[in-house]
Amino acid sequence: MGAALTILVDLIEGLAEVSTLTGLSAEAILSGEALAALDGEITALTLEGVMSSETALATMGISEEVYGFVSTVPVFVNRTAGAIWLMQTVQGASTISLGIQRYLHNEEVPTVNRNMALIPWRDPALLDIYFPGVNQFAHALNVVHDWGHGLLHSVGRYVWQMVVQETQHRLEGAVRELTVRQTHTFLDGLARLLENTRWVVSNAPQSAIDAINRGASSASSGYSSLSDYYRQLGLNPPQRRALFNRIEGSMGNGGPTPAAHIQDESGEVIKFYQAQVVSHQRVTPDWMLPLILGLYGDITPTWATVIEEDGPQKKKRRL
């Protein structure tokens, strides 16, 4: 080992001297680039036939000793590197063989891939010893990462279906309730309208005959209407005011009603009687009661009897 160190020190000193004399770098000398450059210049000078190799070296200012050192160092370095690599290989193989013989002599031969990278073994519970509960947390994370996405997708789809179904049911119920409420409101308004309407019992055929007679009489009196026209001409303003004053005075004093204010009734007006007690109850005559109850969806006792009589008769049980 000491001889190798001595050779290495001498090599370093020689490289420094040669580099100083020739101007070549130590890296170029070790790699062989300096030798290749010198050989190229010497070859160029000798091919011209002017001088020999020794004369060419002297011309470049390089002695034979320096040239020999430059040509020897790359070969020496390559051989030394190969020897060192071989020694390291042999030493490493010996160390591995010793380790195998010492520690794996009584162990079983592994059946795993022999080219697999070797890693140091660690106890799985080591992290749980240092950090209690970390293994459970890591397991939960792995579970969520593996099938958590599918679980969330399934739960989300189930929730969405429930929301859609519940919304549909609520909408159907709301529409149904709104329809029923509007129908009841309309029927109630119609019933109240019928209760508060002025009802008149009229004889339609007699009214038609009277209208025909009036039309015939008006046609026969076509010529007499001309005299009536002149007779019924409009009054001047003073006459009109005097006439209005007489009419208002007679109406205010309870006098007879002028003929212009008398309205011809087309039939007999039905009079409605209100409740005797002040309870704001609705009053309906008997002849209108089935119609009002029918609008509210109720069945009167009379109608119930008719339906029961006209409906299917139940068969009596035989004893």
Curated annotation (Swiss-Prot):
Short motif Nuclear localization signal, span: 311-319
Region annotation DNA-binding: where it falls in the sequence: 306-319
Record GO terms (molecular function): DNA binding; structural molecule activity
Listed GO CC annotations: host cell; host cell endoplasmic reticulum membrane; host cell nucleus; membrane; viral capsid
Keywords, ordered alphabetically: Capsid protein, DNA-binding, Host endoplasmic reticulum, Host membrane, Host nucleus, Late protein, Lipoprotein, Membrane, Myristate, Transmembrane, Transmembrane helix, Viral penetration into host nucleus, Virion, Virus entry into host cell
GO biological process: symbiont entry into host cell; viral penetration into host nucleus
Region D1, residue ranges: 266-301
TM ranges: 287-307
Keyword flag Zinc: no
Lipidation (N-myristoyl glycine): G2
Annotated Pfam families: Polyoma_coat2 (PF00761)
Family that this chain belongs to: Belongs to the polyomaviruses capsid protein VP2 family.
Record text on subunit structure and interactions: Isoform VP2 forms homooligomers, and heterooligomers with VP3 in the endoplasmic reticulum membrane. Interacts (via D1 domain) with VP1.
Protein name: Minor capsid protein VP2
